[in-house]
Amino acid sequence: KLSTYKWEIIQEVTAADERQTTLSYVFPLFRYHERWKEVNLADAEPRPLMKHSIKKGHVYLRDISPQAYPDGFMEPTGETAVFDESALAYTEKSIALCKEKGIEVVLLHLPKMSWTYEKSQAMETFAEEQGVDYVDFDTEEIRTQVGLDPAVDYYDQGHVNLTGSVKVSEWLGNYLDQTYDLPDHRGEEAYAQWDIDLQAYLERTGLS
């Protein structure tokens, strides 16, 4: 069913991706008319709406790819940070919705060697304007506190591996615990599955 909201989304998607067309969203036949070639028995099988996973959306990367921070990493260059306007707009909408629901927001930047000082400063300004907290794992202060070692804690230049993710998670957990009034639900019956999943995760990853 076409609505004003759906129409606005279609216009934004097609403007951002030239491979997408308005017609294919308004008239699905244009998008799926070749689908008959791909249909198989799996398409007839019912699928659960939710799939349980002990990883909770996390992908642990065991491989180690020795890296080195680029020369001048996170030092001022005078360049202007540019962000996708659509991404910023939707971030603003998400923050506004969270505030409406009484949910505190923390903007988080995870380790990435292509990050820059200017982008970090721009995001910090954006967070201040939105009235939310901002944590940047690429600032020297937090990198030092976390203890990330580019020689062993990275999967590639844009992702930490399993050991790196443990360091990041421990720091972030401590930060959230010390900064916000978060209840500890460990051991509570209503959250028992989380305790079970944690133990299974630790055993699977060898972190136990």
Residue ranges and their predicted role:
Residues 94-116:
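Active-site segments of SGNH/GDSL-like serine hydrolases
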Residues 117, 121-207:
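C-terminal regions of proteins
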Residues 6-8, 12-15, 26-30, 44, ...:
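A broadly tuned "polar low-complexity/structure-edge" signature
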Residues 78-80, 108-109, 157:
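A short, structure-level motif marking secondary-structure boundaries and short turns
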Residues 1-101, 188-208:
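Secreted/periplasmic serine-hydrolase-like ester/acetyl group-modifying domain
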Residues 81-85, 111-119:
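Acidic-and-aromatic substrate-binding clefts and catalytic sites of carbohydrate-active enzymes
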